[in-house]
């Protein structure tokens, strides 16, 4: 992350130092607006050009030569792992998420969802951990796919840009990294496998 207080890197921290007992999971139920499995089941119809284009297919995945491509997102393993509304991870970081019902707050430049969301926070913390999922594609590589901003009482804020492939991967696949033709030049990303509930990097 980059801080607006001088554009200095904000340290991500060492997961070994996480004290689960001091973690406070944030209840986001009021802003959840979909099931994560809906991501490629929707039809993203607007805004679109009225003219012939090579635009993204209406299901939100694929390209002009693969217009029917899709991916079945199965979050059964994630939901089965939830106990009393909490997902306990091997990193020691608990996340509040439901076993049933809406479990994601989607934002989008498509009209299906709002283009931004606000989540009220209070108290003090040394860092914040976010469990995120979303889509990206080849043409969105090396540009901001989204932005997270945390605002403080003193009027300042910290900003984290979500950039493919640095810290924003596609939900349906893992990056192939050989250190040669494809080298992210970034630490391995932790991935939560929705179908099994397993966390790995």
What are the language-model segments listed below?
Residues 2-201:
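N-terminal/edge-of-domain interface segments
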């Amino acid at each position: 992350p980059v801080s607006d207080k001088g554009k200095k890197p904000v340290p991500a921290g060492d997961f070994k130092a996480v004290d689960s007992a001091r973690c406070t999971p944030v209840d986001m139920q009021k802003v959840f607006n979909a099931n994560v499995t809906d991501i490629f089941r929707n039809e993203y119809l607007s805004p679109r050009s009225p003219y012939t284009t090579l635009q993204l297919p209406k299901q939100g995945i694929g390209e002009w030569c693969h217009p029917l491509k899709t991916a079945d997102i199965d979050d059964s393993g994630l939901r089965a792992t939830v106990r009393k509304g909490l997902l306990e991870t091997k990193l020691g970081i608990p996340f509040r998420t439901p076993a049933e019902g809406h479990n994601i707050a989607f934002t989008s430049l498509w009209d299906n969802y709002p283009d931004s969301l606000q989540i009220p926070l209070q108290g003090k913390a040394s860092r914040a951990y976010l469990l995120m999922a979303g889509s990206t594609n080849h043409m969105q590589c090396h540009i901001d796919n989204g932005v997270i901003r945390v605002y403080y009482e003193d009027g300042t804020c910290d900003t984290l840009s979500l950039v493919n492939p640095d810290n924003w991967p596609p939900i349906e696949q893992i990056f192939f990294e050989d250190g040669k033709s494809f080298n992210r030049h970034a630490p391995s990303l932790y991935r939560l496998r929705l179908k099994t509930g397993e966390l790995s990097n």
